[in-house]
Amino acid sequence: MEQWYLYKKKADFNQIGEKFNIDPVIARLIRNRDVVGDEQIQQYLYGELSDISDPFLMKGVKEGVEILKQKVQEGKTIRIISDYDVDGVVSNYILWKAIHDLGGKIDFQIPDRMKDGYGINENIIEKAVEDQIDTILTCDNGIAAADAVAYGKEHGLTMIITDHHDVPFDTDEAGMRKEVLPPADVVINPKQEACNYPYPLLCGAGVAFQFMRAFYQAMEEDESQLEELLSMLAIATVCDVVDLTGENRIFVKEGLRRIKDTQNIGLKALLNVHDLMDKQIQSYALGFIVGPCINASGRLESAEKALNLFLEEDEEKAKQTAEELKELNDLRKTMTENGVKEALGQAFEYEAKGDKVLVLYLPECHESIAGIIAGRIKDRLNHPAFVLTDAKEGIKGSGRSIEGYSMFEEMMKVKEVFTKFGGHPMAAGCSLEKGKLQEFRKKINENCTLEKKDFAKKVQIDIDMPVDYITMDLIHQLSVLEPFGKENKKPLFAHRKLKVERVNVFGKNKNVIKLALKSSQGTRIDGMIFEDEDEFREKMGTAKYITCTYYPVINEYQGYKSLQINIQNYFFVEG
């Protein structure tokens, strides 16, 4: 079931269009993304690196820079500990590259997903002590690791935490929240209550990049040297699915602008193995082609393989590693499809029993793909979903949520069932004893206040715009809205009642459907639907008209360009 909504936000779109030399349609789309006022519109359209905030505004950065500067000057050994996802790998690379280039004595360790689980832990601390490490520097993790950080301090380590995840909290008898920060020498996280940094929505790599900007300033080095890292930062920002607004939008735009000129041999090899160097690279390629290969390393082998690719200086070795990462990701895709089939069977069963939050147990599932499967179930059924699997100790897994359900906060309410957990409103991870599984399912559902209407998939339409309005120029102008992603979604238009004059089906699997369409004003245009033919024809029946949402594109074939719409949602009407 779907509910279609149309944005009705107000502004003088003609005036905005004239002032910024854009089509009024573009002005309306910008307003729909809550970009209001000349200053915000200017930054949205033309934001650049000079608009990024002073890194010293971030709580802990000044103190962290002072410690790091001293450690580098004294030749102390610093070890970076990151997460094993794209954001973690890239954060690690940014810190390693920036500190190494200024003469720092630095190495890294990325926790093994299967052996160590998420984040810094006591085993990692003990290994650092054994290796005579002086300072631990975390990235994309650590904010919830109070015990491990305390253990590190007990063993004489200097502990610097950089993270972007939500800060854990306790609730007193009066219902007031109090932050629970790890007892580190310095904590750098823009989500801390006392942090005055104006844009707290950075990913872990964004926090690391800003920390390194401050470090270069303190070392009296030209921070423009760090701009080579922006393409890597763009990958992390897109793949960690943080809001593509404000500073994140600028970082991604600047990174995409530079990515084909990257001097990083490993990144270049990864782009080449997917034939991307000859194409226009946008956020889609980062999120769905490049990023998954980096993630596959941490899922099925060690994330250090991906990090070592970006540190590689030999082109042949880089090419070989990039090909191996692609093969790993292909294997991951197959495993995911099998897991989704099994999970759907359980999901339908629990949904029929009235569960609002789907807690699914797949004992044979590779724990590294639990989050992907949870995301697929969430997308299919529009319910919050957890996928759990057997682990070395107990069970562990990941959850993905829907709008209106903060997964992290709901998990805080039942934290007694977990041995470990953390995350965001929309995604989380957890570990628990196998005997606690049913208790978790029961409690998380008892607390859930979602109603039936919350499970209807919401389709937010930007503009009810007849296809007659589409022009080549408008499609070109739509590119100013890129990069697309969370909170800056690709625009969605709608047309009511287009006549279907012809249906053609293409593709090996008969899942590419081409419609010849005609508007009431006589405009003819092709519409593409990517769906199984049998499913499509069953929906169509004998209907002659279609109402649809779409995104307009330019189709180029044998040198001939034509207008086309890619249809996202639709229903048929008889006449």
Task: List the predicted regions and their residue ranges.
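Active-site cavity-forming subdomains of large catalytic enzyme subunits
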Residues: 126-205, 209-218, 228
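Structural signal for conserved beta-strand scaffold positions within catalytic alpha/beta enzyme cores
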Residues: 6, 161, 187-189, 234, ...
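Short, glycine-/Ser/Thr-/acidic-enriched flexible segments
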Residues: 85, 142-144, 166, 192-193, ...
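Histidine-centered active-site/metal-ligand motif
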Residues: 164-165, 366, 424, 512
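Mid-to-C-terminal polyanion-binding domains and interfaces
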Residues: 66, 70, 74-76, 317-321, ...
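Short, well-ordered strand-loop elements centered on a beta-strand within folded domains, enriched
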Residues: 178-179, 185-186, 393-401, 524-527, ...
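Hydrophobic helix-and-loop "lid/oligomerization" segment in the mid-to-C-terminal part
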Residues: 2, 7-135, 154-156, 173-175, ...
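Short alpha-helical basic/polar micro-motif
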Residues: 206, 371, 375, 548
